[in-house]
Amino acid sequence: MLHPMSRVLVVLGLLAALVLAGGATMAIQRPGPPDRSVRPAEQRSPRQTVNGPPQTVNGPNYPRVRFRASRAIGVPHAGRLARGTRLPSRGPGFDTWDPITRQSPSRGWRRNGTDDLVRMVAAVARRYRAARPGALPMLVGDLSRPRGGDFGPQYGFIGHATHQNGLDVDVYYPRRDGRRGVPKTPAQVDRRLSQRLVDLFVDAGAQTVLVGPNVALRGPPGVVQPFPNHDNHLHVRIANPG
């Protein structure tokens, strides 16, 4: 049988142990300072979250492309773009051109598309450069707005009937004189290099390539089609993967 004083000491010891255990539990549960290096989940793109960091177009000297598991909704003339992927202002074998400011690079809000479209543009540009190392870069015009939708005259004096859901891109024909910029007349178009671009986009799986009726470019019927107001650029559309 314990002496009364011993009982007091035992009780005090148990109480001290409980206090220490409770403090340890509180220390474990108390949140530490936020980790500023981690972006909130809603700010990460699906591609970054699921499949690692953003991918480069081709090597470290070019801007990174943040593929975002984008989705084309609706149809090109009445649709929108979910999680649009932005084409860099420049990359291996291509530059961008703003048809409103008439200078390079194009403003970012004019060059958004689906992941597949951005990949196609980058791939065709690399192949174009490989085939013609001395040629000027492929000159890319409008894709879509960041969330797609109407791309009419209110966004500049050039209106697009399509370009609404990230499946369309304009590419300007190379010039015969080898100068940078957009050809002003069909006579200024380098037809040989332009035909090369058409062939590359067809080989890459383009669903439709619209070309100028006065530029005399050819391709598979039903894919390459002459269309008014396309004498200074070709218009490429890819299929909606669903």
Residue ranges of each PLM-predicted region?
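N-terminal secretory targeting signals
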Residues: 2-84
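Catalytic cores and adjacent binding grooves of peptidoglycan-active enzymes
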Residues: 25-27, 179-242
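Extended, low-complexity, intrinsically disordered C-terminal regulatory tails
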Residues: 57, 62-69, 73, 118-159, ...
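Substrate-binding cleft of extracellular glycoside hydrolase catalytic domains
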Residues: 69-85, 158-176
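Active-site acidic/histidine clusters and adjacent loop/turn architecture
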Residues: 71-141, 196, 200
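Extracytoplasmic
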Residues: 133-135, 164-168, 231
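Solvent-exposed coil/turn segments that connect beta secondary-structure elements
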Residues: 143-145, 174-176, 239-241
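Mid-length scaffold segments of soluble, non-membrane domains
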Residues: 151, 160-189, 193
